[in-house]
Amino acid sequence: MEFWQHIYSNFNVIAFSIFGLKVHWYGIMYVIALLLALLLAKFFVRKFQLDINEKHLDSYFIWVEIGVILGARLGYILIYDANTMYYITHPWQIFNPYINGEFVGIRGMSYHGAIIGFLIATLLFCKKYKANPWIFLDLVALSVPLAYVFGRIGNFLNQELFGRITNVPWGIYVDGVLRHPSQLYEAFLEGIVVFIIVYLARFKQSFQGELILVYAGAYSLARFICEFYREPDFGIGFVLWGMSMGQILSFIMFITALLVYICIKFKKVNI
């Protein structure tokens, strides 16, 4: 276990360099996650014979990726970043991948901000192409969780979003302090477990949009649990009743998904 506990001391976050451009493992994992999500989406379209053609699907994923990046970055700046006012007054710096002339990529993304960007992109896409948004949302609920696993592995390899201090034998040292590998907990619970739940729900699905609501609820619960092992965000800490910002946002997400589910299930709204 000693090698595992000191893995950060023996691991370089930079995978390789091309013409002086440093390629980080996080970036590689992000690309893998994106491609896997698209491949899984195409697989599920065929498997469940969904009314989505491949051209529309490819176009949709481009729209969604743009929405996710914009939402994730803006969400992080508005919710988590200690320099929010700086970015508001210097908006051109929001997506600046350079720090002091060195390429470091775009750092600081919010999952919950990404969700908002994703939903907006989906609604705009479906309005433009006159498509049913619930079909696309349910497809995303199936195809994203396993891809999400690689995103959290990317966080782990990038040595960020680390866990709270612990004494468990599988903990890893971060700056000389033993901590939970919470990124891997999240990869398992928020990725693999959530996928299993959504996939099984597909075979008992009773209305369009049910899968995305099941995903939202399952992810929120998984994230809420994982936050107990993850170090609270720097500069924010515990926000309310000993809960982190991630837990508060996950609680709001869960309640919202539950209310929408109840309204649709009991025919209080039509879709």
UniProtKB/Swiss-Prot annotation:
Pathway: Protein modification; lipoprotein biosynthesis (diacylglyceryl transfer). It is found in: Cell inner membrane. The chain crosses the membrane at residues 25-45, 60-80, 103-123, 131-151, 181-201, 209-229, 235-255. Its EC number is 2.5.1.145. It is an enzyme of class 2 (transferase). Keywords: Cell inner membrane, Cell membrane, Membrane, Transferase, Transmembrane, Transmembrane helix. One of its GO terms (molecular function) is phosphatidylglycerol-prolipoprotein diacylglyceryl transferase activity. The keyword Signal does not apply. Coiled coil: none annotated. One of its GO terms (biological process) is lipoprotein biosynthetic process. PROSITE patterns: LGT (PS01311). One of its GO terms (cellular component) is plasma membrane. A 1,2-diacyl-sn-glycero-3-phospho-(1'-sn-glycerol) binds at residue 152. It is a multi-pass membrane protein. It comes from the Bacteria. PANTHER family: PHOSPHATIDYLGLYCEROL--PROLIPOPROTEIN DIACYLGLYCERYL TRANSFERASE (PTHR30589:SF0), PROLIPOPROTEIN DIACYLGLYCERYL TRANSFERASE (PTHR30589). Catalyzes the transfer of the diacylglyceryl group from phosphatidylglycerol to the sulfhydryl group of the N-terminal cysteine of a prolipoprotein, the first step in the formation of mature lipoproteins. Belongs to the Lgt family. This is Phosphatidylglycerol--prolipoprotein diacylglyceryl transferase. It comes from Campylobacter jejuni (strain RM1221). The lineage of its organism: Bacteria, Pseudomonadati, Campylobacterota, Epsilonproteobacteria, Campylobacterales.
